[in-house]
Amino acid sequence: MTSKVAQTRSEQALSLLRSGYLFASRVRRRAGVSADSGCPVRMPLLGKQTVLVRGEEGVKLFYDTSRVQRDGAMPEVVKGPLFGSGAVHGLDGEAHRVRKNQLADMAYEDERVAEYKPLVAEELAALAQRWQGGDNVYDSTAIAFGRASFRWAGIPWDTQEMDRWAHRMSRLLDTFGRPATQAVAWADRIALDRRFAKLIRDVRSGAVAAPEDSVLAHMAELVDEHGALVDEKTAGIELQNLTRPNVAVARFAAFAATALVEHPEWIERIRAASRAQGGTLLDVPEAVAFAQEVRRVYPFVPVLPAEATVDTEVQGCPVHKGQRILLDILGTNTDPASWDRAATFDPERFMGVADAEAITTFIPQGGADVRTGHRCPGEKIAVTSLSAAVVALCRPEVQLPSDQDDLTFSWTHMLTRPATGVRVRSTR
């Protein structure tokens, strides 16, 4: 562990916008340490003193609720369209604990995940026909994951409406946080909030019958820390937060397709493992390991902010009350101090790992305990979706691309993905 404190004195907001996923490594170099260094870096960001952290010690600080809070840490320009106002992501203390437990009951428990599995398998199996005329992995899996999620939640929409809202959720992720497209992101956020609030209102009034014990039924009964029913907009936002993150897994599905092209030895291995299990798309260990490695190596969220609630320190670096803490997500997932051959794509590292969430520095969807920390409660569902998509992409009739355009993506564009969506075709 290092006790050195590095710093850069210049404002870094513009650098974050321009550098994207390269921001953290560039800041470290400006501060006089190596890009791979685990040394905390002090810097001004959006006019506020900020400490950039990574690795095991950074994770321990960032998710320590006795020292850190989320409320007020993320700029509204990012938080508003992405998460929605009043969502669990910005709550702390008892309010967060109560809300998070209700969401985890819906998405994290094994019986809820089991309800989701046949739905996503059915939707992904249907992609073979859609891919016959040519399509791309990103758009097609966003629709498949969206349909499976809405059906799982008990939302009574027809296929056309499911596709419409899955598309808007997907587009929101492509447009938020950037000046040129922020208006589109806000338009989608407003439309989504209105539609989901109406859905909650209709369930509460009896105009729509939610299936018994469904996610929709429980979200219509969502309460705050005082036991009071939350307003319909907030309940609708949390219903989105149980479905939209799974649509976002399409980004990882596109990256998985590029990884399969670049590591073709895994295609036959995954195909054979699925065949040995009767041709299933679900729970194929090799595909799960491949999916986890995709989530570790490929970029999704670059950094996350929090705020210190007390004077504290990390690795000898003082962190004062009110200062921002910025956790380097990608840098932690690929931290050379935590991972053997950290920069190498190797799904083998996850073979036989029963609980990847127990790995402190594996945080593609947040860290710490799912019920008390800020780890996404839908992580098991996300891994189910991605691993099933990996098996689908390994089917003999599926033709993956060889064009370099399908394998490249921007490291400075947030949120990034292969620009083509990764073109795919099926011969069946």
Name the predicted role of every residue range.
Residues E11-A31:
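N- or domain-start disorder-to-order transition segments that initiate the globular core
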